Curated annotation (Swiss-Prot):
The gene is uxuA. One of its GO terms (biological process) is D-glucuronate catabolic process. Keywords: Iron, Lyase, Manganese. Gene3D superfamilies: Divalent-metal-dependent TIM barrel enzymes (3.20.20.150). The lineage of its organism: Bacteria, Pseudomonadati, Pseudomonadota, Gammaproteobacteria, Pasteurellales. It catalyses: D-mannonate = 2-dehydro-3-deoxy-D-gluconate + H2O. HAMAP family: UxuA. Its cofactor is Fe(2+); Mn(2+). Belongs to the mannonate dehydratase family. This is Mannonate dehydratase. Its EC number is 4.2.1.8. InterPro entries: Man_deHydtase, Xyl_isomerase-like_sf. It comes from the Bacteria. The keyword Transcription does not apply. Pathway: Carbohydrate metabolism; pentose and glucuronate interconversion.
Length: 394
């Protein structure tokens, strides 16, 4: 697989020199300074591309070209935003960039309650605490109708959690959930956040699927025409939250996705950490079944906790994800493609490393400190080497 690294642009505390020293050859990045919905010009794309090439790196994957909320809700100027998206794809293709990762999650890209969860070894990880999240939804945000999604026992547990919170605790939890994370343009006050949630009133799972289907049928033919492979990222976490629909969470969702728009340009970002949170998801089976549609890979592992809806980011080769089996399935697909004349490697990046060692003293993007990802990339490099020697005689 191609070893890549997510980079948040010139303001990322991890430099391109750091990326090279980590052993990555490809960069996963986006033009975060361009507002959601606006066209990425050839000039801006080439400017970023040149910045990477100066350091001997290539722009392997765009993560992400964000999808405007109007497109997801099919309101406002959604057709204009779709037309802009098509032009951005054409511009990327003209610059030689051919993989675009994106997601179709409403409002929030990914959600955690704790961005500094201390592990037994003293490193820090990202965590989703279901009880804390329920306390936020029920007693801080006070989302109308939220009580319908929790049992009386869950509500009592959340209330007890909320009652022992200080004002500082409430502010921190709120910020963690709604202030947005790296790669996301959004950051909301509680009132603004609720207003965004309200945009999805009346949009059921089935209705939301029709919105995604419309987007796919508009965008994917353009991607196919210009040689871009679209790679949708799964929901994180892979279940409905905050009354919002989620439609890219399971193997059945993946099948619907392929059936809805069967062109080869319509594919997946296989994020093991996102899919792996759901115990029912057999990641090896999913990787094998949709191998020919996997165009980009995020490798990380999560550990489900005593409350099965709570989880934290585990060490990359630990946790609930069968990383051995998944990597073997992906390499099998890579060799199959090679036998059929496609020598392109599947780009892989280590996802969400722990904050550790010297990075504990630094200001870092949550989940995206250097050393934890350096460790993860080195571990995946070793795993891939061993698999190739033992199973593929390479």
């Amino acid at each position: 697989m191609e070893q890549t690294w997510r980079w948040y642009g010139p303001n990322d505390p991890v430099s391109l020199d750091d990326v090279r020293q980590a052993g990555a050859t490809g960069v996963v990045t986006a033009l975060h300074h361009i507002p959601n919905g606006q066209v990425w010009s050839v000039e801006e794309i080439n400017k970023r591309k040149a910045l990477l090439e100066e350091k001997g790196l290539v722009w392997s994957v765009v993560e992400s070209v964000p999808i405007h909320e109007d497109i997801k809700t099919q309101t406002g100027n959604y057709q204009q935003w779709i037309d802009n998206y098509k032009q951005t794809l054409r511009n990327l293709a003209s610059c030689g960039i051919d993989i675009v990762c994106y997601n179709f999650m409403p409002v929030l890209d990914w959600t955690r309650t704790d961005l500094e969860y201390e592990m037994p070894d003293g490193s820090k990880a990202l965590r989703f605490d279901q009880v804390a999240f329920a306390a936020f939804e029920l007693y801080i945000l006070k989302r109308p109708g939220a009580e319908e999604t929790y049992s009386p026992e869950e509500q009592a547990e959340a209330k007890a959690y909320f009652d022992q919170m200080s004002e500082a605790d409430i502010a921190k939890l709120t910020k963690n959930i709604i202030a947005g994370l790296p790669g996301s343009e959004e950051g909301y006050t509680l009132e603004e956040f609720q207003a965004q949630l309200d945009r999805y009133k009346g949009i059921s799972t089935e209705k939301f699927r029709t919105h995604l289907a419309y987007f796919l049928n508009e965008i994917v033919p353009v991607a196919q025409e210009v040689g871009i492979r679209m790679a949708i990222h799964p929901d994180d976490p892979p279940r409905p939250i905050l009354g919002l629909p989620r439609i890219v969470s399971t193997i059945d969702d993946m099948q619907w996705f392929v059936d809805t728009q069967p062109l080869a340009a319509n594919g997946f970002t296989f994020c093991t950490g996102s899919y792996g949170v759901l115990a029912e998801n057999d990641l090896v089976k999913m990787a094998e079944k949709f191998a020919d549609r996997i165009y980009f890979v995020h490798l990380r592992s999560t550990q489900r906790e005593e409350n099965p809806r709570s989880f934290h980011e585990a060490d990359h080769l630990a946790g609930d994800v069968n990383m051995f089996g998944v990597t073997k399935a992906l390499l099998t697909e890579e060799y199959r493609r090679k036998a059929n004349g496609d020598n392109r490697l599947i780009p892989m990046r280590p996802d969400h490393g722990h904050q550790m060692l010297d990075d504990l003293k630094k200001k870092t993007n949550p989940g995206y400190s250097a050393i934890g990802r350096l460790r993860g990339l080195a571990e995946f490099r070793g795993l891939e080497l061993a698999l190739k020697k033992v199973y593929f005689n390479d």
